[in-house]
């Protein structure tokens, strides 16, 4: 809408959608959608959600990027991205407030009615905002020409595709590791009420910090911390129940926070000009959906255990390597410093740091030898037990897949 319609028509189209969303209220599901026991659960849930909150959710989710685009038109020179941080503050408050302040004190009918009233108020506020745009000059054509000229002069096709790929991959990886960590904590470790809220709250906090401003994300701090915490994750994985439950939660949640800070911090670094803001958020949403589909649908069909967490950690490492290959100060060309490492990533141990100027790359054979020697040395130096003697464990021909993933992470 922002790219293909002038400002006036954008207001009209979005206003029509807001009115249609009001017509669908209240969001109580229809009686015809009550399950009979013969339906596919996933399909039935999707039908209920689409029929009840489909249009209101569509309007709510599209308003945020559209309002940011309008803000950029009304206030040239001011960054609209801080509004995204504020929207995530609202999401965090709703996450923490609903189970403690709303659900215990209101019936479901009361919740639906109050939510409907809130939606009506929301539409009125959007209407006032649209009315205030009447004094904004229509600069869409000039902006489009400037943006097209800028793209032609400064951006190659390869660069645009690379950055578009990062817009998709970074949020996908963040969502995947969020869901993988949640599964790890709530299904593989302990069933604790409201424990699922902790990973989601940390996930939202990383969005808030990253999009509040570039000064809060420092590569040289977060990437080394994540590497150190990876060692803690591996240690907890090998030790298992020997580690206290609080320690496990701290390690896994710390890895989640740092991973999401890197993904979302790099995502903010690659933010476009306001003219492409809506495309940016659309790609972020698509990436988040892909990450969620991988964990929720694809991983259970492919794996017998919670391998999505291990794969998500691996993906974070891969993205860190690839993002470090981009020069953040001069994106006029894609400078893949890590391209040779990427070709052998699945069989290599690569550490790339701009400040320490260290690049360590090994072949698959060298990595396997390193793993064997390291495990042998650890067995000799400390009591490193995972159920069987390590030298015997490595001779087992039919290793569980999770152990292979752990070896790969090492």
Language model features with spans:
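Alpha-helical transmembrane segments of multi-pass membrane proteins
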Residues: 1-410
């Amino acid at each position: 809408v922002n790219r293909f319609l002038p400002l006036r028509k954008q207001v009209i189209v979005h206003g029509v959608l807001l009115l249609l969303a009001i017509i669908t209220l209240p969001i109580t599901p229809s009686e015809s959608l009550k399950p009979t026991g013969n339906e596919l659960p996933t399909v039935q849930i999707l039908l209920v959600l689409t029929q009840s909150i489909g249009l209101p959710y569509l309007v709510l989710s599209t308003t945020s990027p559209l309002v940011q685009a309008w803000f950029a038109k009304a206030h040239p020179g001011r960054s609209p991205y801080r509004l995204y941080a504020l929207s995530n503050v609202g999401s965090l408050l709703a996450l923490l407030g609903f189970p403690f302040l709303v659900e215990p004190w209101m019936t479901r009918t009361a919740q639906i009615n109050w939510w409907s009233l809130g939606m009506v108020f929301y539409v009125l506020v959007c209407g006032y905002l649209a009315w205030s745009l009447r004094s904004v000059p229509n600069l869409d054509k000039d902006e489009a020409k400037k943006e097209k000229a800028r793209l032609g002069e400064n951006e190659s096709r390869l660069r645009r595709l690379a950055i578009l790929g990062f817009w998709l991959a970074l949020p996908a990886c963040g969502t995947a590791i969020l869901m993988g960590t949640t599964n790890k904590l709530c299904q593989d470790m302990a069933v604790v009420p409201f424990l699922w809220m902790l990973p989601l709250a940390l996930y939202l906090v990383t969005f808030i910090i990253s999009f509040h401003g570039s000064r809060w994300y420092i590569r040289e701090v977060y990437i080394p911390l994540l590497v150190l915490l990876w060692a803690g994750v591996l240690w907890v994985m090998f030790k298992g129940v020997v580690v206290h439950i609080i320690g496990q939660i701290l390690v896994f949640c710390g890895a989640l926070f740092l991973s999401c800070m890197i993904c979302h911090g790099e995502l903010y670094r690659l933010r476009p000009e306001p003219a492409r803001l809506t495309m940016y958020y659309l790609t972020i949403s698509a990436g988040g959906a892909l990450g969620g589909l991988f964990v929720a649908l694809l991983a259970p069909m492919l794996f017998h255990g919670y391998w999505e967490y291990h794969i998500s950690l691996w993906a974070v490492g891969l993205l860190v390597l690839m993002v470090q290959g981009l020069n953040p100060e001069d994106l006029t060309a894609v400078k893949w410093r890590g391209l040779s490492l990427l070709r052998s990533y699945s069989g290599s141990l690569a550490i790339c740091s701009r400040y320490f100027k260290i690049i360590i790359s090994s072949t698959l054979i060298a990595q396997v030898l390193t793993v064997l020697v390291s495990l042998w040395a650890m067995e000799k130096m400390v009591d490193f037990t995972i159920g069987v003697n390590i030298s015997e464990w490595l001779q087992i021909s039919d290793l569980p897949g999770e152990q292979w993933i752990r070896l790969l992470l090492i």
